[in-house]
From Swiss-Prot:
<keyword id="KW-0791">Threonine biosynthesis</keyword>
<dbReference type="InterPro" id="IPR013750">
    <property type="entry name" value="GHMP_kinase_C_dom"/>
</dbReference>
<keyword id="KW-0028">Amino-acid biosynthesis</keyword>
<dbReference type="InterPro" id="IPR014721">
    <property type="entry name" value="Ribsml_uS5_D2-typ_fold_subgr"/>
</dbReference>
<dbReference type="Pfam" id="PF00288">
    <property type="entry name" value="GHMP_kinases_N"/>
</dbReference>
<dbReference type="InterPro" id="IPR036554">
    <property type="entry name" value="GHMP_kinase_C_sf"/>
</dbReference>
<dbReference type="GO" id="GO:0005737">
    <property type="term" value="C:cytoplasm"/>
</dbReference>
<keyword id="KW-0067">ATP-binding</keyword>
<keyword id="KW-0547">Nucleotide-binding</keyword>
<keyword id="KW-0963">Cytoplasm</keyword>
<keyword id="KW-0418">Kinase</keyword>
<dbReference type="InterPro" id="IPR006204">
    <property type="entry name" value="GHMP_kinase_N_dom"/>
</dbReference>
<comment type="function">
    <text>Catalyzes the ATP-dependent phosphorylation of L-homoserine to L-homoserine phosphate.</text>
</comment>
<dbReference type="GO" id="GO:0005524">
    <property type="term" value="F:ATP binding"/>
</dbReference>
<comment type="pathway">
    <text>Amino-acid biosynthesis; L-threonine biosynthesis; L-threonine from L-aspartate: step 4/5.</text>
</comment>
<dbReference type="InterPro" id="IPR006203">
    <property type="entry name" value="GHMP_knse_ATP-bd_CS"/>
</dbReference>
<feature type="binding site">
    <location>
        <begin position="95"/>
        <end position="105"/>
    </location>
    <ligand>
        <name>ATP</name>
    </ligand>
</feature>
Amino acid sequence: MAGPAFRAAAVRVRVPATSANLGPGFDALGLSLGLYDDVVVRVADSGLHIDIAGEGSETLPRDERHLLARSLRTAFDLLGGQPRGLEIVCANRIPHGRGLGSSSAAICAGIVAARAVTIGGDGKLDDTALLELATEIEGHPDNVAACLLGGFTLSWMEGGAARAIRMEPADSIVPVVFVPGKAVLTETARGLLPRSVPHVDAAANAGRAALLVEALTRRPELLLPATEDRLHQEYRAPAMPESMALVERLRADGIPAVISGAGPTVLALADEASADKVARLAGEGWAANRLSLDARGASVLPLAA
């Protein structure tokens, strides 16, 4: 059987940063942020060439070990076969190892680009299959769901398959991220979590996660109580004490703040009136960035955009 046909023209994919957990929504809730990696992929006659600019340009591999390349290969297998060669250009703006979904962005960029460059790819790999594939590669759906769908997402596993719904966050919310200079490996942060937690803590988080859906979509004034967490942040504090100290300081000032994903970035959910002031609160050692909310998720764009 003949393999798939590929487009001669390059495709450009833009993928957003994401913040998972958002306090109580451990491994379930995700928010898409207006900070992007751009990837251009072109089918070539032979070989694999990867060019990287920006974040990770000095450390990321430029061969088949690159997560983007591995994700492309996995998607091409599902689409019916591999191209003879690939040229990949990455413009990375999402910090690596900081809890802003850089690995999910690479995975989503790879599988979306593979579908886009394959003629008839949409019919072979629909959006549901994209989410399932991204989750299979990443290991959990919270970041990849937000990266693919944009907005505010709730994801879960059902019968071994990833599922997600997208909601529209309140447009008055202005995310502010505080990025430290030192990375924390996701594996390190996950390794600090206990095998079990007290029932009272699990019950409290369930209530707060439910409240957070209402707060993020309709009633931002409830974000401070809605972002309270008992399941993971305190357990991870030994790996990121400065981050937890900043979260506690911001919350004491009435600002909804959480560890972003597995950390160590801190995410504050401000509004237009307070965002600039909030961004100045971190002090030395932090890169504070006021961001927008992303509504599009992973997108195929014109090369000149």
